[in-house]
Amino acid sequence: MTRRLFTSESVTEGHPDKIADQISDGILDALLAEDPRSRVAVETLITTGQVHVAGEVTTGAYADIPAIVRRTILDIGYDSSRKGFDGASCGVSVSIGSQSADIAQGVDNAFELRTGASESALDAQGAGDQGMMFGFACSETPELMPMPIALAHRLSRRLAQVRREGVVPYLRPDGKTQVTVEYEGLRPVRLNTVLVSSQHAADVSLDSLLTPDIRDHVIAPEVEGLGLGLDVEDYRLLVNPTGRFEVGGPMGDAGLTGRKIIVDTYGGYARHGGGAFSGKDPSKVDRSAAYAMRWVAKNVVAAGLAERCEAQVAYAIGKAHPVSLFVETFGTETVPVERIEKAVTEVFDLRPAAIIRDLQLLRPIYSQTAAYGHFGRELPDFTWESTDRAADLKSVAGA
């Protein structure tokens, strides 16, 4: 059988785009904690010595945005000019307006309610925008994620951990990982290449210090004993291939909310509708429906209805009911895909208000989603990672 290579990347919490995501979600959480019905769309731009926050907010809450910005940056580890950024002394500008009344009327008073087609409370909330959202799951890992992105995230988290714990004390917060996996058909069989790029202090030897430390303290703990049938012997290791990575963080590159949407999802292994997540409250289906589609796809795979599942949903702004649902199982289904799709429509309510209710999305839980992936981490607050509907799906699909 033909063998092919697939690659996914991850970034650490200190990557400039991820700093921006964490600031935006930190502001969102602060507002939701005081007013769960807050409407929030906050974008962050971070560059050398400066942070700019802009967007639209309608809320009864108050958030000290400059304080949130500084606390987020300091918590990540940018606390000195030697690291290229200092959260205590950077400039912060804020430009926040209110949500458009034209959008609000469609969200608060959905098409179905306005036209008299329904009086259901769940039909009262329309989608906050048009668009299509995808979810994906596969049986490659215990968390039902593709192997390349799952391993890339593990390495990024470990890279940050050894920096924070002082195991590799000369590391700085900015970093990236990339993993290439060899596939035989649809099955991952071999780790081919691992790339790690990490910001570091000055005068650190790449060959005699950084590369051995990355191999021993970052990669080895994650790949040794990984199991899952993956051959992890003799993979190629690349560490800081430019030869030096002293200038990093916002000094090296400007960061912007929503610029790591593939890192946030499935590492390019599945399709993406294009909408970013961070800084958006759950009335925005870009976020809430993408979470719901992960929930759907994961339950399809957990139910044994398919080994791989991609689910797409689409909405019209101001309408509660989706305009379409599409389920793809790539020939791995155990029952006809039409039955799976029908079971999904019976078991899951994909109206925005129902998604928010079922996944408990009005809680201030979003800061923890903003780095290391929104999917595949089975944390208590990540309700979309639950497989609580698998038995119902299996029963309705007649499996």
From Swiss-Prot:
Record-annotated residues binding L-methionine?
E56, Q99, D253, K284
Name its pathway.
Amino-acid biosynthesis; S-adenosyl-L-methionine biosynthesis; S-adenosyl-L-methionine from L-methionine: step 1/1
Q: Residue ranges of region Flexible loop? A: 99-109
**Details of cofactor binding:** Binds 2 divalent ions per subunit. Binds 1 potassium ion per subunit.
Q: Which Pfam families match?
A: S-AdoMet_synt_C (PF02773), S-AdoMet_synt_M (PF02772), S-AdoMet_synt_N (PF00438)
Residues binding K(+), per UniProt: E43
Instruction: Give the function comment from the record.
Output: Catalyzes the formation of S-adenosylmethionine (AdoMet) from methionine and ATP. The overall synthetic reaction is composed of two sequential steps, AdoMet formation and the subsequent tripolyphosphate hydrolysis which occurs prior to release of AdoMet from the enzyme.
By what name is this protein known? Answer: S-adenosylmethionine synthase
- Native source species: Salinispora arenicola (strain CNS-205)
